[in-house]
Amino acid sequence: MKSNEGKSMTTPEWAKHSPYDRYFDFIAPNADRYAILTKQISAIKFNSTVINVEGNNHIFVFPAGQKSLRSARGVFPFSGSDPYLFSAHYDRVAGSPGANDNSIAVFHLLSAALALAQKGIDRWLIVFTDKEELTAGESFEKQGSFTLAKKIKSWGLEKAKIFNFDACGTGKVFIISTTTDLILKTSGQNSLRPNIRKVIKNIASLRDHALETAQKLRLERVLLAPTPFSDDVGFLRAGLAAQTVTMLPANEANQYEALLRDRPDFGNLIISGEVKAPAEYRRLPETWRSLNNAQDTPSRLTPEYFNTFVNFVVGLCTGK
């Protein structure tokens, strides 16, 4: 096995097939993740456009039949309509392989794009966002999704149904995040945007659709619960609704659900940052404690559930 480099001599079966065949290159220590990702998008023959917003390179992927921004003379695909917009950040914290956060969700979405193409479904966009990970002291206004959301609105995509995927490679339990609910409840009126009622309504609609999709697919388990911050917070701060979805192993989901019953305030600790205190941090699911550090390795992934995720994304597009 190659130590700390690209592909292993014993590459797992799932990583031998497109689009996952560049996954191990993507998580290598010195990987040029932007270059690898854009080349892989080209290799699987999807249209794409890279849009730089305040120094962050966001990669948009379109169905093969849709023109990219450049070839459409500046008109963004689906402008004025309500496509599904699936987001996943492709940056990672320095020193972490980023196997689950968030490399696997990136490749899952490419796999979902191929599945959607096979079914002839083309009312979707994917955006791989830059700068989801913030450094100490940075506000959410520095998050890539915050400045991107402002552009999305100016492109006529304010009606897009945004689903954000983060850390979706470990376990089979889908966690439908309620973090934005807590932020809205704890925010002072001065920080709320004028269209906040519309945003709240849209978040509820996205969540209902996620739950309906899970029911339609007969997923074994779904949990509504607060989760660590993701791009949904940046979207929210800019006045766009987005629903984050993540995944956990069943035993961790059970323990977390029990914790939330005993400690209804625990979600507020995530919002305030107090969860970082050692006494509280150890209560987080183990999967989440492994993120943003050297423990976020491929050994923690559960490939037997990868298709479940892809089917969920496809299911979102085949609903209402």
How would you name each of these model-derived features?
Residues 27-35, 99-103, 107, 139-143, ...:
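Soluble non-cytosolic domains of exported or imported proteins
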Residues 1-38, 91, 282-296:
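N-terminal capping segment at the start of a domain
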Residues 20-29, 47, 93-102, 138, ...:
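Second-shell loop/turn segments in exported
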Residues 252-320:
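His/Asp/Glu-rich mid-to-C-terminal helical/loop segments that flank catalytic regions of hydrolases
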